[in-house]
């Protein structure tokens, strides 16, 4: 069944006196299926979230290439990908570092009997349920996953290491519910190899995709058959500014008034039919860290 089959967990027990049972871990699986043909088949179908059944470098690199294509400047159909990881923190962060994508997020649930595909499916379902791209996913429950042994639960130190290593930690919360600690992507470094937190939170890329679509939809609705004259850029700029103001009211972006001078719409110097726009987008961040100091008064 491929390398993924090695992740199937087996256990055995016996209630008969004097009889012991031993379960041998699954081995021998190799060569997971290539995801490239499947991704190519759905490239033009339209999607927002793709779940990878395999948590392997080859599969996730193929997914990364696909997401960069459909979300790029030509297709402009923003999408994200997810995978699951029930293994160790070390192997998970190593895998995340190999992917380094702001569009791929991996859910880490150590010690789970669930397969990576099952963890990923549950995680993706929660992502799809949140319609506000800027709202954090902290504490949201992932249904259908097993409750791991307390010896496998991650502590705050491990969770922080996971977050800054490109993994989304899952934990067993009150009422024995599996919850998201904080949703992050595998993006850790820029092309120069320098640590870059710009796209670490999953909400950032989802917000940017949301803003892009909102702006494109407004221009398509207002100017379906527009002439391009000297009067056109100011009208387009006014519409874009209105979109940003409305997004600010929804707390998806902020500081629109302070940044509006950076909103530039101008005709292209080479293509007579093209209008270029520079749209400043100050995304609303999530409240993930609270720091306080207790002063003793006597």
What are these regions (language model features)?
Residues 29, 125, 165-166:
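Glycine-centered small-residue hotspots that permit tight backbone geometry or close packing
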Residues 1-117, 259-261:
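Polar low-complexity, Ser/Thr/Gly/Ala/Asp/Asn-rich disordered segments used for subunit assembly
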Residues 87-162:
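Loop-centered beta-sheet repeat module
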């Amino acid at each position: 069944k491929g390398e993924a089959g090695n992740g199937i967990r087996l256990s055995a027990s016996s209630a008969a006196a004097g009889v012991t049972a031993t379960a041998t871990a699954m081995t021998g699986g190799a060569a997971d299926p290539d995801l490239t043909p499947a991704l190519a088949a759905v490239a033009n179908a339209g999607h927002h979230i793709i779940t990878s059944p395999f948590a392997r470098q080859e599969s996730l690199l193929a997914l990364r290439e696909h997401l960069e294509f459909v979300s790029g400047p030509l297709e402009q159909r923003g999408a994200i990908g997810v995978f699951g990881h029930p293994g160790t923190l070390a192997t998970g962060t190593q895998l995340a570092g190999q992917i380094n994508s702001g569009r791929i997020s991996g859910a880490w649930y150590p010690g789970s009997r669930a397969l990576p595909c099952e963890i990923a499916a549950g995680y993706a379902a929660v992502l799809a349920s949140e319609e506000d791209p800027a709202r954090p996913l902290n504490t949201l429950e992932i249904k259908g996953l097993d409750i791991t042994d307390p010896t496998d639960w991650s502590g705050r130190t491990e969770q922080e290491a996971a977050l800054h290593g490109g993994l989304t930690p899952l934990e067993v919360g009150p009422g024995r519910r599996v919850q998201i600690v904080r949703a992050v992507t595998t993006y850790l470094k820029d092309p120069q190899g320098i640590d870059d937190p710009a796209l670490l939170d999953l909400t950032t890329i989802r917000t940017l995709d949301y803003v892009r679509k909102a702006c494109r939809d407004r221009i398509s609705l207002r100017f379906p058959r527009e002439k391009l004259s000297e009067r056109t850029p100011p009208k387009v700029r006014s519409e874009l500014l209105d979109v940003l103001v409305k997004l600010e009211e929804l707390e998806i972006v902020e500081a629109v008034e302070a940044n509006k001078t950076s909103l530039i719409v101008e005709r292209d110097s080479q293509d007579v039919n093209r209008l270029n726009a520079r749209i400043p987008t100050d995304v609303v961040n999530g409240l993930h860290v609270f720091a306080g100091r207790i002063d003793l008064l006597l």
